Amino acid sequence: MTRRVVGFTLVEVLVAMVIMAIMAVMAWQGVDGIVRTRDATQARLEQTLRLNTVIAQWDQDLASIQDSNAVPQALACDGASVRMVRRTPEGLQIVAWSFRPDDSGGAWVRWAGPAVTSIGDLQDSWLRSLQLQGGEQGSLKTLTGMTGWQVYFYQTNGWANCQSTGNKVAQTGSGGQPAPRIAPPAGVRVVLSFAPGSGLNGDLTRDTLLGP
């Protein structure tokens, strides 16, 4: 008696292949989703770390402000830039933070002049900070994807736009000498606005207390 050979029919094989193909696609989509989530999380983490580093530098600059009596103000704001005199181990240094348009929409740029030890060099560096265009040596794009920023000074028991508090950038006096200085405010508030898709959507507000 001949034994009957048992096996899969062609239809069963095709059905099995279709099922395996569907499972493979689902598995790939799952892996792809995990990879995309990981990449997005990593990018977000890097952006957050960079933001924290930049804000820490901003705070450090403000904490190091030194009233030198050699320039109009230890801290000045003209709307486009915030300039300050900060102390370093090598001497005094002029630092300027500015908002500059770029391909991402806008960037927060930090310029740092050389540390100097003479009044003349400090005044020259201050005057140079009034003419920055954004690409000078010492300039660094700290954050990108921005749409704008606002700066407020705390004086007379309240916050006000830095240009309306009396801490405007002073004009130079006769002979190119800086005009009398203006005392810094008690605190500084910066509001950074980020564009959609930048990874840091919305506004970030940071308040920094000055002085002892």
Where on the chain are the PLM-derived regions?
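Short, glycine/small-hydrophobic-rich surface segments
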Residues: 62-86
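Short linear sequence signals and composition-biased patches located at protein termini or domain-edge surfaces
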Residues: 143-212
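Solvent-exposed loop and beta-edge segments used for protein-protein assembly and interaction
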Residues: 76-78, 89-91, 182-184, 200
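Type IV pilin-like appendage domain
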Residues: 79-164
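Residues embedded in well-ordered secondary-structure elements
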Residues: 73, 86, 135, 179-181
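A short, compositionally biased
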Residues: 77, 102-106, 183-190
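Aliphatic-rich helix starts adjacent to a transmembrane/signal segment
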Residues: 2-64
